[in-house]
Regions:
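Heptad-repeat coiled-coil amphipathic alpha-helices that mediate oligomerization/assembly
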Residues: 2-23
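OB-fold ssDNA-binding interfaces and closely related basic DNA-contact patches used
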Residues: 21-61, 94, 106-108, 117-140
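A short, structured beta-strand/loop element
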Residues: 51-74, 157-172
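A cross-kingdom feature marking solvent-exposed beta-strand/loop segments within repeated
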Residues: 66-85, 174-188
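Compact, well-ordered interaction domains used in eukaryotic information-processing assemblies
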Residues: 70-76, 80-106, 110
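Short glycine-rich, low-complexity/disordered patches
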Residues: 98-127, 209-224
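Short, solvent-exposed interaction modules
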Residues: 116-185
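Mixed-charge, glycine-accented linear interaction segment located at domain edges/termini
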Residues: 161-224
């Protein structure tokens, strides 16, 4: 192979390498942007955390992911996802920032009960019997109930409790949980008053930004 041809091959190899590096860089940027958008709030404890994600904004839902992990191995022990309608999430955020939920929590805490009752809870939800069967999630034919609530905490002002139980779909399609026994999954995430406010602000700002972007990009029904 003569010298000129070798130089040309080296030049082509260099160009291909530059293109490959560019593609990898763009993919990395794309991944970073996706992570930033999809995961917009997080509350952590020593062995649990709750993340709030925008993955399901396109279907009008906010995704709350709860995880419990082993502190030594840092591996996940239990996890569950709960979906909330956007408008319900906005109402939840407003109830926090307006002081309604903190006031209810203070009133409940003042009763002096060892285990204060929840002052707020998500609507009944989960996976119905048909989908459970299709996905092979249970062998008893029951639905899966998933919800979480917020109550006054012991060491922290507030604690989120996410629970999964067997359930049954009612005539309205809501999944009624069975309370005759311990939950199959239970994950608690305690938080401070400031963390709760930050969560509410993040929910509001991200949903409002998403909806504003829909209007800006004309991503709405124009047939009316």
């Amino acid at each position: 192979m003569d010298k000129e041809m070798q130089q040309q091959l080296n030049f082509i190899d260099k160009r291909l390498q530059n293109i490959e590096n560019y593609v990898k860089k763009q993919e990395s940027i794309k991944t970073q942007r996706k992570t930033l958008v999809n995961e917009f709030a997080e509350i952590n404890t020593l062995d649990t955390f709750m993340k709030v994600k925008a993955n399901t904004f396109n279907i009008g839902k906010v995704l709350f992911s709860f995880v419990k992990f082993d502190k030594k191995t840092m591996k996940s022990i239990e996890s569950m996802d709960v979906y909330m309608d956007m408008d319900d999430a906005l109402l939840f955020a407003n109830d926090i920032l307006s002081g309604r939920i903190p006031t209810l929590a203070a009133t409940e805490k003042a009763k002096g009960e060892k285990y204060p009752k929840a002052v707020w809870s998500t609507k009944l939800g989960g996976i119905n019997e048909k989908k459970v069967k299709e996905r092979g999630l249970r062998e008893d034919g029951k639905a899966i109930s998933r919800l979480f609530n917020l109550a006054p905490g012991a060491r922290q002002p507030f604690v989120f409790t996410a629970e999964q139980r067997p359930g049954k779909s009612d005539e309205k399609g809501l999944i009624q949980p069975e309370y005759n026994g311990r939950p199959e999954i239970q994950i608690r995430v305690a938080c401070s008053a400031d963390d709760l406010k930050k969560l509410a602000i993040s929910i509001q700002s991200n949903i409002n930004a998403y909806r504003a972007a829909q209007y800006a990009n004309k991503e709405f029904d124009t047939t009316w």
